[in-house]
Amino acid sequence: MKNCERFANLALAGLTLAPLVVRVNPNLNVILTACITVYVGCFRSVKDTPPTETMSKEHAMRFPLVGSAMLLSLFLLFKFLSKDLVNAVLTAYFFVLGIVALSATLLPAIRRFLPNPWNDNLIVWRFPYFKSLEVEFTKSQVVAGIPGTFFCAWYAWKKHWLANNILGLSFCIQGIEMLSLGSFKTGAILLAGLFFYDIFWVFFTPVMVSVAKSFDAPIKLLFPTGDALRPYSMLGLGDIVIPGIFVALALRFDVSRRRQPQYFTSAFIGYAVGVILTIVVMNWFQAAQPALLYIVPAVIGFLASHCIWNGDIKPLLAFDESKTEEATTDESKTSEEVNKAHDE
């Protein structure tokens, strides 16, 4: 891990814990936390092998519709069912997800302090009555699961803002690390769709704000304000993950060309500008704002402007990680065939 990545991880940990001991300006906290989380997730997304699955254009076009259906369903559940019952079910669901996400987030750091057999040797566990079902894991994954279980139990018991944020940040980092848009065309379709999705549900209906306030699960980050009337500022995880996977794609584009992360820098600066604009407008109007309204144009605008300036629009639009994956697979098959022929 490079020094800047290590510093970013430490900065994110310190910023998350800081409100426990000192009063941190919530606006500054939102901006720094969002930006550092995207930075960490982006560099974790750079792998030696291309992603096994990428989002298609059809999936990107359907995403806002599926998101709208889920949002409206949650709104109706909270409206017609007991809020405590709905949150109890959601807490159980996120308990399992939280253990998996936090364990995966901590695993790279934990592996460095464990012996190699703990990291490499797989343990296969079969379900007692379903022999066909099996789970593979290593001892290091079990060790990483211990703090994951602790924080999930703490959140389920106390619903403390720190436990909420630790789980939320884990979801964000894993989302940016694991999700691949495949191409910038798909990314533009997704961001454009969610741009209008965010505007509609925040400005034209009470649904988004109502669900965010009622949904007692780590789908948003909470930043203590010290104000009894409004104890927390909130930032939805989607406002980090959705632009984050686009910024991560820009970083992997730079890496694929074996160049300095110039387009990543442009997209990342665009994200930071978008978050700052969101905070400024929110404080100016004293009302909830659809963050993607400001983040999406900033990210795409900064990246596109830089590409146009350098004359790199064509290679940017031609970049496709799914094709990279196919090429890598073909190369590995060819290599295997050559080795077999050599052995014969």
Swiss-Prot record:
Span(s) of short sequence motif PAL: 290-292
UniProt entry keywords in alphabetical sequence: Endoplasmic reticulum, Hydrolase, Membrane, Protease, Transmembrane, Transmembrane helix
Lumenal side: 1-11, 84-89, 158-160, 210-230, 285-290
Keyword Endoplasmic reticulum: yes
Region of interest (Disordered), residue spans: 323-344
GO biological process, one term: pollen development
A cellular component term, taken from the record's GO annotations: endoplasmic reticulum membrane
Tissue: Ubiquitous with the highest expression in emerging leaves, roots, and floral tissues (at the protein level). Highly detected in pollen.
Record family assignment: Belongs to the peptidase A22B family.
Protein name as annotated: Signal peptide peptidase
Organism of derivation: Arabidopsis thaliana (Mouse-ear cress)
